[in-house]
């Protein structure tokens, strides 16, 4: 088993990256997959949403793991990896990661430190999902250099075109220089308010603008007050509000992501005949 590595990325904040990473990850685990989540955000948003409200008190986080790689020191198997009761493992993050980002600037192979760490764990999982911070800094570049695929959550409340252009330009650069296998799985519309026409207009605009280059997922994540409550609870939407529209949205996304993988495997098998 070698993990599919998926970065959840968008340099704009507040678009649902952490919520998507958590619920897609747990959605995959509910489908029998072995999943690891990676918090690559110094604020520790993913860590908090998985039930650790004080990430700064954790003794071993992604920062320490990357520090071991930088110093060329072995990492004891499983060191720092936490387990969530809904069936996913995760490597937490805290404010120390900001210092690590500064250290990376002068490091050798600075763009691939996260990849080197994930190489040490990838055989144990079917999927590794990376929650990126809202910037295009060195940590996000590390995530893109490590990932095989990217999902881009986009809030359906504003015109995202300019930010997307920057992100796609960075993805193109990483693909050319560091990670030729990198591909965009798709754009995921989040916080969709179906009571307004605006969300539909954004969806149509995205499909018209990027539809030829990039998939826009059929699954959409609706706007919901209940979804905002879950980050304080340390639970997924599947436990917090299992019959709600957000849980349905993430169930659909999970199926869509798994179907994409099947299509790719079939395509690869057909090519190798």
Range-by-range predicted roles:
Residues 1-273:
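P-loop NTP-binding core
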């Amino acid at each position: 088993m070698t993990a599919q590595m998926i970065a959840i990325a968008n340099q704009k904040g507040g678009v649902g990256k952490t919520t998507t990473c958590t619920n897609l990850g747990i959605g995959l685990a509910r489908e029998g997959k072995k999943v690891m989540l990676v918090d690559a955000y110094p604020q520790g948003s993913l860590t908090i949403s998985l039930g650790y409200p004080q990430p700064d008190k954790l003794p071993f986080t992604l920062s320490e793991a990357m520090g071991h790689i930088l110093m060329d020191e072995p990492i004891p198997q499983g060191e720092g990896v936490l387990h969530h009761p809904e069936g996913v493992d995760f490597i937490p993050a805290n404010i120390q990661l900001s210092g690590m980002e500064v250290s990376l600037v002068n490091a050798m192979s600075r763009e691939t430190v996260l990849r080197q760490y994930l190489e040490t764990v990838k055989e144990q999982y079917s999927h590794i999902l990376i929650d990126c911070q809202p910037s295009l800094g060195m940590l996000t570049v590390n995530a893109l250099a490590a990932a095989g695929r990217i999902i881009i959550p986009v809030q359906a409340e504003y015109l995202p075109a300019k930010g997307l252009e920057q992100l796609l330009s960075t993805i193109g650069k990483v693909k050319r220089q560091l990670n030729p296998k990198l591909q965009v799985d798709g754009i995921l519309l989040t916080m969709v308010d179906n009571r307004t026409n605006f969300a539909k207009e954004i969806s149509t605009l995205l499909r018209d603008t990027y539809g030829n280059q990039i998939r826009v997922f059929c699954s959409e994540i609706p706007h919901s007050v209940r979804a905002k409550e879950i980050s304080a609870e340390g639970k997924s939407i599947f436990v917090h509000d299992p019959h709600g529209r957000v849980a349905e949205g993430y169930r659909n996304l999970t199926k869509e992501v798994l179907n994409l993988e099947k299509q790719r495997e079939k395509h690869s098998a057909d090519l190798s005949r």
